[in-house]
Amino acid sequence: SERAIKWFAAGWLFLFLMRVGVYYHLEVMVILPLVFVSNKHPWRSLVAVIVASIWAGMSRVNWFPMPAMIAIAIYFLETPLNSSATESNSTSFKQILRYLSQPALWGVAGLISALLTQVVYVYLSGNSGNADAFTSSFTSDLLWYRLWPNANFPLGVIPAALLVSGPLIVTVTLATHQWKSLHSIRWLGLIGMLLALFAGSAVVSTKIGGGGDLHNMDAYAVLVGIVALYFFSGRVQAEPSEKQ
């Protein structure tokens, strides 16, 4: 049944994230958008993104954009750009701007919430005089060799990440064979975010203290897991002209 599939998908995603190494406190930023974001409830969705982003501001800097990115991915997966087959034949620039206005709002609101929260957090911590300590991750050395097989991580970050997420990548790749089912704007948004998170997570893995396992690839793992499960469970909403 549909209910059983949902529980199976949720259970599998939880186990996958545990295998990658997504820490429990970071999963708050995954659960809130998944539970509360919906194109039918814009205000509830915005509140969920802001609350999750506030938590991100107290957690990890490379997760600042994640609540908004998860919400945007859900939006691209569930919301067709056009409301009818007639509109699909001639999408105007105005329609595209209107469609992207919601994701843009989430992105801006989420980042501002996370950044402001970090400022407040630094101040309340009593270490505002040593604020540079909170941004040391931006200035630490990059150990690029950790991306590939090495003594610290025999498999290497990139090969291991591709191996673990391989079935998910295959699922998304197979879905692109039906590329007309989604407007190109939706595909560009989804694939662009996945590539950005893979590259960004790989860079974070080269920082001192990272690269010994896959825990710094967590942001990428979360999004590719969500996107792949949407396609696998048939929850992606096609454009009207492609619906059977």
Where in the sequence are the language-model features?
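Transmembrane catalytic cores of multi-pass membrane glycosyltransferases
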Residues: S1, G11-H25, R44-V47, I54-A221
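Signature aromatic-anchored transmembrane alpha helix within multi-pass, membrane-resident enzymes
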Residues: I5, L100-V108, V236-Q244
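Hydrophobic transmembrane alpha-helices
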Residues: I31-K40, V49-A52, I70-N82, G225-S233
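Short linear functional motifs in flexible/disordered or boundary regions
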Residues: P67, F231, A238-E239
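Alpha-helical transmembrane segments
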Residues: I169-L174, A228-G234
